[in-house]
UniProtKB/Swiss-Prot annotation:
EC number: 2.7.1.211
Domain of life: Bacteria
Membrane topology reported for the UniProt record: Multi-pass membrane protein
Domain remark in the UniProt entry: The PTS EIIB type-1 domain is phosphorylated by phospho-EIIA on a cysteinyl residue. Then, it transfers the phosphoryl group to the sugar substrate concomitantly with the sugar uptake processed by the PTS EIIC type-1 domain.
Subcellular location: Cell membrane
Lineage: Bacteria, Bacillati, Bacillota, Bacilli, Bacillales
Transmembrane segments: 112-132, 148-168, 178-198, 208-228, 248-268, 289-309, 329-349, 359-379, 387-407, 430-450
Catalysis performed (reactions): N(pros)-phospho-L-histidyl-[protein](out) + sucrose = sucrose 6(G)-phosphate(in) + L-histidyl-[protein]
GO molecular-function term, one example from the UniProt record: protein-phosphocysteine-trehalose phosphotransferase system transporter activity
Name of the protein in its database record: PTS system sucrose-specific EIIBC component
Induction (UniProt): Induced by sucrose. Expression is regulated by the antiterminator SacT.
Active site: 26 (phosphocysteine intermediate)
Organism expressing this protein natively: Bacillus subtilis (strain 168)
Keyword annotations of the record: Cell membrane, Kinase, Membrane, Phosphotransferase system, Sugar transport, Transferase, Transmembrane, Transmembrane helix, Transport
CDD domains: PTS_IIB_glc (cd00212)
Amino acid sequence: MDYKETAKRLIELLGGKENIISAAHCATRLRLVMKDESKIDQAQVEELDGVKGAFSSSGQYQIIFGTGLVNKVFDAFSKEADIEREEHVNHQDAAKEKLNPAARFAKTLSNIFVPIIPAIVASGLLMGLLGMINAFHWMSKDSALLQLLDMFSSAAFIFLPILIGVSASKEFGSNPYLGAVIGGIMIHPNLLNPWGLAEATPDYMHLFGFDIALLGYQGTVIPVLLAVYVMSKVEKWTRKVVPHAVDLLVTPFVTVIVTGFVAFIAIGPLGRALGSGITVALTYVYDHAGFVAGLIFGGTYSLIVLTGVHHSFHAIEAGLIADIGKNYLLPIWSMANVAQGGAGLAVFFMAKKAKTKEIALPAAFSAFLGITEPVIFGVNLRYRKPFIAAMIGGALGGAYVVFTHVAANAYGLTGIPMIAIAAPFGFSNLIHYLIGMAIAAVSAFIAAFVMKINEDEERKK
């Protein structure tokens, strides 16, 4: 594949360089913010060598190339389109300008939590390894290696406010190191750590007529999000009114001291209550709606993926882990993803065209590994009926994992990789997860076969 020629041809089909505002890429997709999407030749873009699908979502025109390939295409594309790498930082802002307030809020949460996923995944996998070591008695509990693994596995969750502080500061346009400081203040060693001391009673201090609990915010999400948002406003306002000559001295000082007081007096307790309220509400629905909740969430999750809003769920999942120590939403999302793979596999066996088969098989296996965009946009949504079949499979699998109370100890992994973060909750939890995967994939496969596909009738552009 000639990446340079592909990039040149792609630019032509997109309406020329002048129609491209900014470009970036994720693990599988080239993400573009366009001036006028009506100038794009959608049909020809999808026929381009290496393209597995193209669609418009979340204020961006997204072209699926797949893992590895997208990096090489992007390098050639950015050169041919005269897009400087420095402009990539502004890509998210350019995309968000085209969204409505609700979508913009979801996009903001996504931008904050997606960069943190590797840290959470690493901790979750380490917890899985730790759980297996304890379950099978591979090491003595007094082993130095076991104690180190325990520290490694809990670090990301204990210091989560610092990670969020850095990421949220970047998203809100403030200094990420000040964000890290605010996150650090909220988990200071002088504060009682609720992560490991859930039953302990914190001391109180009296300040400005308020009783402030000396309780840390380790593992919390909403308190630090709100605190860093306020910090960004304080920093920007201070920078506007402070003379440039003393900006470096005054702005950080005012920002940290004002945000710190506000965080402990108001934002922290409010954020903790809000986060606990969300957890209680979700747990109530989970406990009382039972498998019906799994049926609905599992069936509709793929529709949510189409909007890009699904990344904002990471904030809720992180809150669940902090509050109750487990994530019962992720297994439901995983069923929806696996079902997309099952439907995509059915398309591979039903398809007559070589290009369809060429796209469907790797895209289906990608979904089994947790990356669904190629199979959703490149295969199932293109022929519509397989997408509906996947929704059916996701609903059935989701109902099963809720009925059997399957949970995970992290977020960000679905499909086969999620086995590692489901295992720590015991053999039964793991077996039910595998059964749920089988139900989702097989039912989606069968439903897609029953519905059939017409390769000459693709989704409407």
